[in-house]
Structure formats: structure tokens, C-alpha cells
Amino acid sequence: MIESYLAFIFLNKVNKKKAPSLDSLGYEEIKKRHDELVKLIRKYDYAYYVEAHPLVSDQEYDNLYHELETLEKLHPELITPDSPTQRIGETPLSGFSQVTHEIPMLSLENTYSKEELFAFLERIKRALPGKKISFTVEPKIDGVSISAVYKNGLFSLGATRGNGTVGDDITQNLKTIRSLPLRLETPDPPEYLEVRGEAYMSPKDFERLNAQREKEGKVLFANPRNATAGSLKQLDPRVVAERPLAVVFYGAGKLVGMKCKTQEEWLNFLKKIGLPIPIVFWVCSNENEVYEAIGKLNECRNQLPYPTDGAAVKVNEWEYYSLLGYTAKAPRWAFAYKYGAERAKTRLNNVIFQVGRSGTITPVAEMDPVFLSGTTVSRATLHNFDQVKRLDVKIGDVVYLEKAGEVIPEVVGVDLNQRRGTEKEIVPPEFCPSCGEKLSWEGIFLRCENENCPAQLKERILHFAQRNAMDIQGLGESLVDQLVDKGIVKDVADIYDLDEETLVNLDRMGKKSAQNLLKAIEESKKKDLSRLIFGLGIPHIGQKASEDLARYFGTMDKLSHATEEELLNLPFIGEIMARSIVNYFRKEANRRRLEKLRKKGLNFVSTLSQASSGTLSGKTFVITGTLSEPRESIAQKIISKGGRVSNSLSRKTSYLVVGSDPGSKLQEAKKLGIPLINEQELLEMLHGG
């Protein structure tokens, strides 16, 4: 009977005949077939999306998938969370909730130097005298860091790294990625399994995606990593499902109900239960084998399906991780060796001058298109005029290109042997190419001091509206050009005065587009203070610093009145950053902008802010020495309970937290009579003990 039903499903596609009633099959037969289909499709998904070896034709796969959809439509009670039909949600999200990483997601220290790599390996051996140590060498994948949680084998939570301590809940978006199994392939799954890795887009898929976007008149993505990050930030999982994303896992987070002894054992375990892992990795017993493996990886990395920019070298034995510990930002048991940037050669045809949001003039080279590190490049930065002089680069030269950080194309050299004598000097402009104001030099930088400069305003608006700031979807480059050029928007705050009547009269803006944009603008008012701080574009203040400032000060009023001295006491703020913040809020134009944003109803209070009446309220802590967790993670826990963390001791310091190998602060605290506590005592205070 089931075979008869399958035959009719297929014939239905060809002859448009109706399938027989499923009632005649019997419920148990239907349920059994449903389970078979789920397992079959999961098997075919793994073969196609992970192993790149399809087991059936597209038509056969589609027939099975359609049959499963039909069964579940007629019997919705059969739908399980791991069914392939449940990957794509029907309803867009209103926003991303936050996920706290119980074990922080850290980055790796890195180097381009063989000597520094060997020094790292030597430090490991010195820290573990007499121990037998081996190392793994894995591809350092240039994607977006993610965490995936499986409870009793079922995928239940996905998150971004965020600031390492708190990330975004992207569960619904990760479910759309076919290489991520919704259920682990094991009859005895761990109670709780957190795996960490990367979401990525292959260079070939990236090129195809951009080609399609170009046909549709959409803004192109800069590189595969940006395309991946932008896709995961989409609120509508249906949009994410259309993007060619994949995942690969290599790291461990929180584990309950399982143990591994080595990184090699962990990777093999992940592969066994159906999770995609790096295609190649090596286990090495000494530094020479490590360096040899790094060389082998470099030879084959362009054949891998994911972009890589180096090798991750890790201590293989997990038991040593707690002994080696962590720095403030990275584990001491792992290190990244980065390969020298890939180079390309092309002719420089022209130089244009771009005006940044702070008024800095950047010379940009226009060149014959050339393929470089996964993308076709026709423009590259020359950074500044000091760099132009140092390279002795001229219009008409054949130049060498690299991608800074594997992202931004830059001119790094000139092939002087190909000079023809017709090349032209690159002359710095005397007047701003946007507003016509006379330019002035500030060190090696050429700047436009006119804050009303249209080019600066456009860049400020685009920065303010970007995904990591106020996330105003629809406010792209083309529309911003029109709004500024027509004099409709003269300040960032003016975007909150836009109305439907104004927008529908602009090019490529219909009624629906205008309504969607206005909705996005209204929604942006609810964004957390951290996003607003980042969106303001304060020089030297990035996304993470913005989150830290919002968490510490809690309100825009407190931040805007902070002194340089107060800022310098924060563990995450340096001298240049502190001065930049104070100078920003001193400017009258910036104060006026903030007041207008306040009146328009933007959120000036952070949900990330420290508890005003927490267990550590009113107490100030200074940390010295090495703790079991990164210092930044400990500091965030103190702040979340209402406490403050400072870099320097004073008579107002409540406690000095003392870890192993403390510095000079220990003696200084004793002289000042400041109470000393260890990490365990701090943890008891954090939990109200």
C-alpha cells in the first residue's frame, strides 16, 4: 500500500492524478513511513551538504521531501522538531534575544612569524614540565563564530559570539542551514552538548550570490564573511534559507553527560554523530611537525570549501587546558598562525578621493578588475598620502594588491620594472571633493573640517543605520544620496522626521518600500543604548566598546558627562578612547544632535546596564594575577551585580581580587589597607554569599 502511495505521488507530478486516501494505509504504517522519510532526508542532507557527495538526484530528493510535506499536512501531530520541514519558520522575528555564554567564547592570539609560533610552543612545554604533549593543527576558518546547543541530541539553541560573554539568539536562522543537523546521529546522545565553530559561505557560492544581487539591483556584499554575518542578522529566517550558508564545528562549550580526553577524540566524535568538522587536521608531537602541517595546510587551503586565513594550533590534551589557563582575551593553550596575505597584480588607472564620516580624505585606486582571495576587486585603498609617497605609486602603474585582514583590498607595492614613463603623480586635493571647503593637514591625514559636508553626512547616516548600530533596513547608499543631495536630511537626527509623502517621491521608492522604511526607523527607537553609542560614530569606539560603555554607565546622560579620569579607570578603555569620548560630547553640534534624538524618542537607557541594587552595588574591585576565567569575563560578572571594576587602586577600592602570579598591585593594596580576596571568595560574593 505504501509503495502504491509513493507511485501515485510520483505520477501525480507527471499526470496530475490525485493520490489515494491515506486512511486506507493505516495510521501505524503512515507513522512508520514518516519516520523513514525523516531519516532518509537527514541522510541525504548530510551526504549533499557536508560530504559533497549526493546519493540521489534532485528530483528523487524533491519527491521524498514533497511526500513528507504531504504526510505532515494531513497528520500535523507527526511533526517533530527535527523534521526537515521544520528548518524554515513562517514568521519573521521581532528582534534577537540575548544569550549568555556560560563559558566565554574567546578569540585566539595570532602571529605571522615562525619564531613567535615556536616561542608559543616552547611556553607550553615550560608550563607543563615532564608532561607528554601533542598538538593539533586545524584550518583557521574565516567565518562567523557560532555556538550550537543540542539537548539529548536535539538542536535547541544557536548563538553568535557577540562580545564573547553575551551573543544573539540565532536559533531560527541556524535551523535553515542544511549542513547543521537538527538531530544528532547517535542512539545515546549527551544530555547537553555545546559545539562551537563557524558559519561560512564558500567563495563560489559568494560569487553566485553577488551575481544574482547585481541582476536584482541590490547592494553587493563586500566579501563572504560580511555576507555570512549579514545573513545571520536577518530577522526573517526565510531570507536566511535562500542564502548559501554552511557550518563547520571544532570547539567545545558546556558539556553534560560526556567527556573527551583530546581534541583529536573530540573532532572524531563530532564527525561520528553527524556534525561537520574541518576536512583536514593533523596531530603533531613536536614543533617541527606542527610547522610542517601548517605548510601542508597552506598548500591545500584554496581547495577547501571555506575561506581560511591561517592555521589554529591547539594543545591536543584537554586535561592541560585548566593548567594553562587564559589571558584576558584568549586561551593560553591555542594559537593562530596566519598566512601571508594572498597577492594579485593589476594596473592602476585612476585615483579618486573619498571623504570619511570624520572628514578624513582617503585616496582610493581604481584598477583593472582582478580576482583576489575569493572576490573580484576593482578598487583598493591607498590609506593616506604618506603611504602614496612611501610606495612611490603613480597613476598608470602596475601595482600589487593584498586584502588587509583578508577583507579590505589595499595597494601594497609597485612593479617598477613595468613603468613606461607616462605615469602621472597622485596629487593631494586642495579642496574637499564633496563640499569644496579648503582642506587642512593633521599629521599624515588630510581632513575636511566642514561638519556640514555632504559626503561626511552620508557616511555618518550609513554608519548610524548599519546592521550593528540602529539596524534601519532600507536606508541604503542610493537612498541616502538622494536624501542628502535634495537637502531633505541635513543631520543624522533628521531621518526621524521623514514621512511617507516625502519618500514616495524619491527614485525607486514605492509606497510599500516607504512604509517598510518608516517602520524600520520607528523600530530603531527601541534599540539598546549600546547600538546608539556605536551608531554615533565616536572615533575609536567600536561595537564592543559601545556595549561595555552602555553596560557600565547605563544611560546616555551618565556617559556624556563622564570625565577622562573616570573613563581611564575602566578596564576596557584606553587613553585615546577616553579622550575621543570626552571630545565628542564637548562639541556643540553633537550635543544638539543628541538632544534632538532624545526628543524623537530614542532609547537612552541600556538593558545591558549593571544592576543598581545588585549584591555588589557600591563596591569597587581591582583584579591582579591570573584567574580561571579571562579577566574581562570576571569584570562583566562584577558589573552585572552592581559592582564597579577599575584598573587602578585607590583608597576608594573595596577589594583587590588576587589570582595566581599577582603583580605589584598586591603590595600596593597591602600598603593602602585594601581587603584582599581570592577568586572563590569573589564567586561567593557574586552569588550573594
Curated annotation (Swiss-Prot):
The answer on whether this UniProt entry bears the keyword Magnesium reads yes
The BRCT domain is annotated at 611-689
Specify the species. Answer: Methylacidiphilum infernorum (isolate V4)
Q: What is its EC number?
A: 6.5.1.2
Task: Tell me the Gene3D superfamilies matching this sequence.
Answer: 5' to 3' exonuclease, C-terminal subdomain, BRCT domain, DNA ligase/mRNA capping enzyme, Helix hairpin bin, Nucleic acid-binding proteins
UniProtKB keywords? DNA damage, DNA repair, DNA replication, Ligase, Magnesium, Manganese, Metal-binding, NAD, Zinc
Catalytic reactions of this protein: NAD(+) + (deoxyribonucleotide)n-3'-hydroxyl + 5'-phospho-(deoxyribonucleotide)m = (deoxyribonucleotide)n+m + AMP + beta-nicotinamide D-nucleotide
Positions annotated as active site in the UniProt record: 140 (n6-amp-lysine intermediate)
A GO BP term here is: DNA repair
Q: Which GO terms describe its cellular component?
A: cytosol
* UniProt keyword ATP-binding present: no
Describe the function of this protein: DNA ligase that catalyzes the formation of phosphodiester linkages between 5'-phosphoryl and 3'-hydroxyl groups in double-stranded DNA using NAD as a coenzyme and as the energy source for the reaction. It is essential for DNA replication and repair of damaged DNA.
State where NAD(+) binds: 58-62, 107-108, 138, 161, 198, 314, 338
What is its cofactor?
Mg(2+); Mn(2+)
The parts of the chain that form a coiled coil are none
- Which residues of the sequence carry a binding annotation for Zn(2+)? 432, 435, 448, 453
Q: Which family does it belong to?
A: Belongs to the NAD-dependent DNA ligase family. LigA subfamily.
Mention one GO molecular function: DNA binding
Put simply, this protein is called: DNA ligase
Lineage summary: Bacteria, Pseudomonadati, Verrucomicrobiota, Methylacidiphilae, Methylacidiphilales
InterPro entries noted in UniProt: BRCT_dom, BRCT_dom_sf, DisA/LigA_HHH, DNA_ligase, DNA_ligase_AS, DNA_ligase_CS, DNAligase_adenylation, DNAligase_N
